[in-house]
């Protein structure tokens, strides 16, 4: 079996390395493709080591036809509008991030149009934005595949295309899916992380099947992305397999390596991404001061040890340690299967974090995990759907403190208990390993991929589709020929005009969406503005 694994960027290789190795061990040919060399600083060496043992092709092209900018504008706008769904309306940071990308993520000649569309959308109520998002979804369905992607897949002729992470700016992967569907190649989307279906935008093009971590993600696909539940399989989170199997470094050895006193209690601070906690160093300083001035002698003597988020590792240097009051900063070239992260948590009596997947790893080890709700973190916590999944009140491992003083009180109880956690075995099984807490997930991924290749093959009329592909590939070759360039572009422009006209018709005939209380602007006013925007230049 020949499998093409579209990773989007090299950095995303790390969550599926064991799955790829498992497929190759069963004799399957696996080629990984990436459109970017991006790798987080602390995962760079791990990724390079994986590359040495796997076949990785860097495909650097993006959509090449006259619809390239229009399709990007359409997808950026739809991501922005998608956050008007009832469950996502508190996700203000994610919505504003999408708006900023809409205004700044296009070629210069399109930025004025993008800014205009952004202002129009920002002035609409939630219901109106959702209606516009639905019109964009119809436009997406009518967007033809790009010949360059079709040719890329036609030459390789895989039995299956697997894509990840797909959502959040990996728009080239959607064009890869379009090309695969045109050729009759089955497509599986492997969900990358715990937050991908709520913080990274909408699923613009439906794959044939999706592999998810748990029942929560299956519901998210149905409720937020309108994806049919019968095309979803729950497998678990393979990225934690090695972490479940790890053993700790001896305490004296670990402490000696970082200048820590093994006799003192340790507290692990698990760093968040800067998008979640922009000024995390200031909070760490406040926490450190609160611990040192605590009336509890064990807390006052405790060493606060930071394990930075992979994306912020370069922000922490010697001066940062001194200014933040940390006892040590522990960073390593690993991202997954991180022995240092395991040791930091294992040798601590508790872990503290704002909103990070490392809190999940603390639960795997069995340490108490705490967060604190402060005004500066409100949007990153209350405004994040996935954050609620980890809270103790919802069956998760994380206990919430209402203030810094409350956090210190909870830490005092934890140190008195010797770091024993109340335990969250149900969370670990339902959220990470739904097929059994003792069952590694990567082999399940391999089994399901093998099963789906067989199950999905009859759904495709491969012969008919590939006959059409030959015609499209010929068009691509003709495009490069100077004498046919004008004809190709003219046809593309006609297709684009037809697409805009269709979208304008949909908008014109759409019923007025629900209005929010207090709004006086009529729906017809903004429908007309958007209609003019879509048909401008036709």
Identify the residue ranges that each predicted region occupies.
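C-terminal amphipathic helix plus adjacent low-complexity
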Residues: 271-275, 394-538
């Amino acid at each position: 079996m020949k499998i093409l694994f579209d990773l989007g960027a090299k950095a995303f290789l790390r969550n599926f390395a064991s799955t790829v190795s498992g497929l190759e061990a069963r004799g399957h040919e696996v080629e990984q493709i990436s459109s970017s060399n991006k790798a987080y600083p602390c995962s760079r060496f791990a990724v390079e080591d994986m590359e040495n043992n796997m076949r990785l092709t860097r495909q650097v092209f993006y959509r090449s036809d006259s619809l390239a900018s229009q399709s990007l504008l359409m997808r950026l706008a739809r991501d922005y509008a998608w956050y008007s769904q009832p469950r996502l309306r508190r996700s203000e940071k994610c919505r504003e991030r999408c708006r900023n990308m809409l205004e700044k993520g296009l070629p210069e000649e399109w930025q004025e149009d993008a800014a205009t569309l952004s202002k129009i959308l920002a002035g609409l109520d939630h219901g109106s934005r959702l209606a516009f998002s639905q019109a964009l979804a119809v436009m997406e369905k009518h967007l033809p595949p790009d010949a360059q992607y079709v040719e890329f897949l036609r030459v390789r002729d895989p039995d299956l295309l697997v894509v990840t992470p797909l959502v959040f700016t990996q728009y080239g992967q959607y064009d890869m899916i379009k090309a695969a569907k045109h050729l009759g190649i089955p497509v599986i989307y492997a969900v990358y992380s715990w937050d991908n279906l709520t913080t990274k935008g909408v699923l613009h093009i439906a794959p044939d099947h999706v592999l998810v971590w748990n029942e929560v993600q299956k519901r998210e696909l149905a409720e937020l992305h309108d994806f049919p539940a019968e095309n979803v399989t729950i497998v678990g989170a393979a990225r934690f397999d090695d972490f479940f199997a790890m053993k700790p470094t001896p305490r004296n050895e670990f402490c000696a390596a970082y200048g820590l006193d093994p006799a003192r209690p340790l507290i692990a601070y698990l760093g968040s991404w800067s998008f979640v906690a922009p000024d995390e160093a200031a909070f760490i300083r406040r926490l450190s001061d609160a611990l040192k001035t605590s009336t509890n002698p064990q807390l006052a003597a405790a060493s606060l040890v930071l394990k930075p988020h992979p994306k912020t590792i370069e922000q922490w240097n010697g001066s940062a340690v001194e200014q933040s009051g940390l006892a040590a900063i522990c960073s390593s070239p690993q991202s997954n299967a991180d022995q240092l992260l395991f040791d930091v948590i294992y040798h601590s009596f508790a872990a503290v974090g704002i909103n990070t997947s490392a809190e999940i790893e603390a639960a795997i080890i069995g340490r108490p995990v705490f967060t604190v709700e402060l005004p500066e973190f409100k949007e990153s916590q209350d405004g994040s759907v996935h954050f609620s999944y980890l809270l103790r009140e919802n069956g998760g491992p994380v206990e919430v403190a209402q203030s810094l003083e409350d956090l210190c009180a909870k830490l005092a109880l934890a140190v008195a208990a010797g770091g024993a956690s109340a335990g969250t075995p149900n969370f670990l099984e339902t959220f990470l390993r739904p097929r059994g807490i003792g069952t590694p997930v990567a082999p399940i991924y391999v089994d399901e991929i093998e099963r789906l290749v067989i199950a999905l093959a009859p759904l495709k009329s491969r012969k008919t589709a590939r006959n059409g592909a030959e015609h499209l590939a010929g068009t691509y070759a003709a495009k490069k020929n100077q004498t046919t360039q004008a004809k190709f572009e003219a046809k593309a422009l006609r297709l684009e005009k037809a697409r805009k006209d269709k979208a304008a018709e949909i908008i014109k005939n759409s019923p007025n969406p629900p209005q929010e209380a207090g709004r006086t602007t009529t729906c017809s006013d903004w429908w007309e503005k958007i209609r003019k925007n879509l048909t401008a230049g036709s």
